[in-house]
Amino acid sequence: VRLLVSPSRESISWDLAETLAQRDLPACLRLFRQLMFQKEKPFLLLMGIEARIRDMLALRELIEAGHLRLSYSGSYVNPAWSELPEAREAAQSLVGHLLKGHPFRLAMLAKAASGFTTVELQRWYRRTVETHARLTEGAVPDDLLMECLLVELIQGGRHAAV
């Protein structure tokens, strides 16, 4: 199917962020390099990754607060919201845009978020924001900054020298 169907811009960012969330460095770098070959803009890819991490962080906080529970049926995850009014309010304020979307996307993001601690996601988000700022400086090539970010995030904080 991948050979016959042209990916949309949203699916390109989603696929890259998915391999990042799975901490699959070879697949992540392979996909990133393919996207660079296809002349995708590193800045736009980074924006997609930032949004993904921000959503995962919000979902992780909801999981830790007990507002969101995950149950598994094989490889499928089923998110269940608490019936408490404060849970609904928290969900609406943190991930209201996800609640309006397809439930599968919410389930996939919640599953990914459950594989991280809040501290990890906060560090990842901080590093993407720092990289975003460095992209605007223009001192280092955008693709090199992005590749170093991907390596650093997946390897767990060991800084790539740029």
Annotated model-derived regions:
Residues 1-11, 19:
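Long, charge-dense, solvent-exposed interaction surfaces that engage phosphate-rich ligands
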Residues 12-15, 19, 27-162:
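C-terminal alpha-helical interaction modules of replication/initiation AAA+ assemblies
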